[in-house]
Amino acid sequence: METNGSYNPAPIGVFDSGFGGLTVAREIVKALPGESLIYVGDSARCPYGPRDLSEVDGFVQQICSWLVAQGVKMIVIACNTATAAGLAHAQKGFSVPIIGVVEPGARAAVHATRNGRVGVIATKATIESGAYANAIRHIDAGITVFSTATPRFVEIAERGIRMAEGPVEDYTSLASKVYIRPAFQEIAQDYLDPLRRCGIDTLVLGCTHYPLLKALIGAVIGREV
């Protein structure tokens, strides 16, 4: 990554409440193979979703402060709850660029929808913050947003990583082997059937853990979404 026309070899900081942000880190490595990363998975305080947003904001500032002390040149908050709770505060408080994951997801949903009916699944804190609904409507006020808190998906994703044998390098393979289980499908149906009945044609996975569950979610929500 170049800064003022010259390459800056400092690492990029990436953090999440646990394993989920590795899905974002993986995409950064694919897009920027020459960059080095420092990843923080705050598994000691995972999940963030049930916590008060002010508490999560405190976690965000603490982790950003540590990453800045390590000499990172920018920070990616690879957690939707943390983005909703602390991105704006962190951007004002630190000199390095800090980006989150809500706005890119909202823009992708606006561009993808054909019928203007978008579903959002995320943690309780992210849904209650209104971050995605507000971001989507800011881009296109004509879109109807249906939001559902799906906190048990984080638990399933974290359990699946721990159940996997060997290094987790192929998330698609992991999803098909670990997450397609009857008990998990029942939970997914309880969460997703109401959204499907709302007629959505686009679903935002508003938590970085959720791409691990794409096969499970896709099997329930249907190919038309």
Residue ranges, per PLM feature:
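Non-catalytic structural scaffold of enzyme domains
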Residues: 1-225
